[in-house]
């Protein structure tokens, strides 16, 4: 049978020292959590700035390779060690072509590298030629309906075209792309899931 409690059996009230110790532990936990959040944010910023970042495709200029709404990962690190290769799909800031009203300098573009520095390029009868050799392009939406006379790509620049050639605002409209404008190479599509995979 339970004995009735007596005054000397009651739990003593919390002391000021006990309350202070509990408060200190709480603030220590809050500080640790804040440090974790801050470190995570810094790492995310560094990764996005220097390593890789996600991108969204808003236009049809790269159809059929990329569809409107595709979400990609852009590799921002590789071009620090080597130059772009022909065939790379690159994300870049458009050059200073402000006379073209449909180009927004704050919006990044995505196109395919076709001509490299020192290479001779021309478009004739629906075919791209590099150094007088026809370029095999099995990724095109349809045959090219414009022509370009022969030219040589200058040093420090590349010639880029969209895969949807006849509906792409690219080098055939505004000229060469300075390499320094390139943000990175689009290499992986992570959405939609049924089209998940590398970009070639």
Model-derived regions, located:
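Protein maturation boundaries and topogenic segments
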Residues: 1-108, 179-200
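A broad, structural micro-motif
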Residues: 57, 108-110, 123, 153, ...
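Mid-length scaffold segments of soluble, non-membrane domains
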Residues: 108-134
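Acidic loop->beta-strand submotif enriched in PP2C/PPM serine/threonine phosphatases
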Residues: 141-156
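Phosphate/adenylate-binding glycine loop and adjacent helical scaffold
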Residues: 162
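Active-site loop architecture of trypsin-fold serine endopeptidases
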Residues: 166-173
């Amino acid at each position: 049978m339970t004995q009735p409690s007596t005054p000397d059996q009651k739990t003593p009230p919390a002391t000021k020292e006990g309350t202070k110790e509990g408060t200190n532990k709480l603030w220590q936990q809050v500080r640790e959590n804040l440090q974790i959040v801050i470190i995570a944010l810094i790492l995310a910023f560094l990764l996005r700035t220097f390593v890789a970042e996600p991108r969204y495709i808003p236009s049809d200029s790269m159809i059929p390779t990329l569809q409107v709404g595709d979400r990609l990962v852009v590799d921002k690190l590789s071009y620090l060690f080597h130059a772009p290769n022909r065939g790379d799909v690159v994300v870049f800031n458009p050059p200073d072509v402000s006379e073209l009203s449909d180009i927004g300098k704050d919006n990044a573009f995505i196109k395919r590298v076709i001509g490299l520095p020192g290479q001779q390029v021309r478009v004739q009868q629906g075919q791209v030629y590099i150094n007088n050799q026809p370029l095999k392009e099995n990724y095109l939406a349809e045959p090219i309906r414009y022509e370009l006379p022969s030219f040589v790509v200058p040093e420090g620049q590349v010639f880029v075209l969209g895969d949807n050639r006849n509906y792409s605002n690219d080098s055939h409209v505004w000229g060469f792309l300075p390499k320094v404008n390139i943000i990175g190479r689009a290499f992986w599509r992570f959405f939609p899931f049924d089209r998940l995979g590398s970009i070639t």
